[in-house]
From Swiss-Prot:
This is Large ribosomal subunit protein bL20. It comes from Streptococcus thermophilus (strain ATCC BAA-250 / LMG 18311). It holds the Pfam family Ribosomal_L20. The gene is rplT. CDD domains: Ribosomal_L20 (cd07026). SUPFAM superfamilies: Ribosomal protein L20.
């Protein structure tokens, strides 16, 4: 049976990892072992933070809606409850966009919520 030499395969595998580690700081883009560890961590961070990003944006939208609602004399929870009572289905992303870019439209929604709350 012939002896198998894995030089080509090993070199290809190492090159692939080092290519993924391009731009990393210090030894992490030069040494194979540290590069491999960092690439594995990077995949983990990417996976985790794709989920975290959704939570972060929701927090940002709620903060913006709350700030705009308080300018109209409501708290965030009162505004959301009033909109639900008024059967106005607008998601938080759209509400936050209105709060930042179209204050008049947001005020109209806040007034509709106030009317349903009896304020």
């Amino acid at each position: 049976m012939a002896r198998v030499k894995g030089g080509v395969v090993s070199r290809k595998r190492r090159k692939r990892v080092l290519k993924l580690a391009k731009g990393y700081y210090g030894a992490k883009h030069i040494l194979f072992r540290t590069a491999k560890e960092q690439v594995m961590n990077s995949y983990y961070y990417a996976y985790r933070d794709r989920r975290q990003k959704k939570r972060d944006f929701r927090k940002l939208w709620i903060t913006r809606i709350n700030a705009a609602a308080r300018l109209n004399g409501l708290s965030y929870s009162q505004l959301m409850h009033g909109l639900k009572l008024a059967e106005i289905e607008v998601n938080r992303k759209m509400l936050a966009d209105l709060a930042v870019n179209d204050a008049a439209a947001f005020t109209a929604l806040a007034d509709a919520a106030k009317a349903k709350l009896g304020k």
